């Protein structure tokens, strides 16, 4: 950013120098008629203007450097979007999501998904935002066996838990770890299809299963 500011101000200074040169040239015969005094005066005025702008540039760079060194660093792009959502950086968002996932209970066993290594911190990825500037998070999970019949239910539990747990809009992509399930492609489509998700949650039996898996421990 500092180099950008210097460059823009340098361009501005070049513009001033060009104007001064053109003005001096346009003076033509009248400038010569008036002697060298007016020419020297014009040159001195131009030099003073450029010097003033140079000092302003240095001051702006100094202030910007100081702001960057403060605790509240200047944020750009994806980091700025995360700041708007209340996170210092990607790591804080990843940790927040993992705290939601770690307590989800397995549909069959008396364990959490964290206990079984179905979910893990390295499986949470903050992706570039959408064109409409919505944050995107990808969650990867690893079923305990390649033929796990409850993989779709687990994916649904992950989605519902995170969407309810975060107080802001986010695009959530959930995928089975590559090669971890025999029908991973079909399951990935199901757990990322809004219509299928809505239909599944309208089923009272399936909804009860999800609620039991994601409810907080008392």
Swiss-Prot record:
Predominant cellular place of this UniProt entry's protein: membrane
Entry keyword Glycoprotein: no
Gene deletion effect: Mutant flies show temperature-sensitive lethality. Prior to cellularization many embryos display signs of incomplete chromosome segregation during mitotic divisions likely due to defective organization of spindle microtubules.
One GO CC term on file: cytoplasm
InterPro entries (UniProt xref): FSCA_dom_sf, MIP18, MIP18-like
Subcellular location: Apical cell membrane; Cytoplasm, Cytoskeleton, Spindle
Modified residues annotated as Phosphoserine in this record: 14, 65
Entry's Gene Ontology BP terms: cell division; nuclear chromosome segregation; protein maturation
Ranges annotated as biased composition (Gly residues): 28-37
Disulfide bond positions: none
Listed Gene3D superfamilies: 6.10.250.1280, Fe-S cluster assembly (FSCA) (3.30.300.130)
Entry keywords, A to Z: Cell cycle, Cell division, Cell membrane, Chromosome partition, Cytoplasm, Cytoskeleton, Membrane, Mitosis, Phosphoprotein
Chain spans, region Disordered: 1-59
Residue ranges, compositional bias (Low complexity): 12-27, 38-54
Note: The name 'galla' means splitting in Korean and is derived from its role in chromosome segregation.
Subunit organization: Component of the CGX complex composed of crb, galla (galla-1 or galla-2) and Xpd. Interacts with crb (via intracellular domain). Is not able to interact with Xpd in the absence of crb.
UniProt family annotation: Belongs to the MIP18 family.
Task performed by this protein: Component of the crb-galla-Xpd (CGX) complex which is essential for proper mitotic chromosome segregation in early embryos. The CGX complex is also required for cell proliferation in developing wing disks. In the CGX complex, acts with crb to recruit Xpd thus forming the functional complex.
Designated name of the protein: MIP18 family protein galla-1
Source organism per UniProt: Drosophila melanogaster
């Amino acid at each position: 950013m500092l180099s950008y500011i210097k460059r823009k101000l340098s361009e501005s200074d070049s513009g001033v120098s060009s104007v001064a040169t053109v003005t001096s040239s346009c003076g033509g015969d009248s400038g010569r008629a008036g002697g060298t005094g007016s020419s020297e005066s014009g040159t001195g005025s131009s030099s003073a203007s450029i010097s003033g702008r140079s000092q302003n540039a240095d001051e702006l760079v100094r202030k910007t450097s100081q702001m960057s060194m403060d605790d509240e660093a200047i944020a750009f792009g994806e980091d700025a979007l995360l700041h708007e959502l209340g996170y210092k950086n990607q790591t804080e968002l990843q940790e927040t999501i993992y705290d939601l996932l770690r307590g989800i209970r397995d549909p069959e066993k008396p364990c959490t998904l964290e206990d079984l290594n179905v979910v893990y911190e390295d499986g949470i990825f903050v992706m570039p935002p959408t064109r409409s500037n919505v944050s995107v998070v990808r969650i990867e999970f690893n079923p305990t066996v390649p033929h796990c019949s409850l993989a779709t239910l687990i994916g649904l539990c992950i989605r519902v838990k995170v969407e309810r747990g975060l107080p802001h809009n986010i695009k959530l992509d959930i995928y089975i770890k590559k090669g971890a399930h025999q029908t991973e492609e079909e399951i990935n489509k199901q757990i990322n299809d809004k219509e299928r998700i809505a239909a599944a949650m309208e089923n009272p039996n399936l909804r009860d299963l999800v609620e039991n898996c994601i409810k907080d421990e008392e």
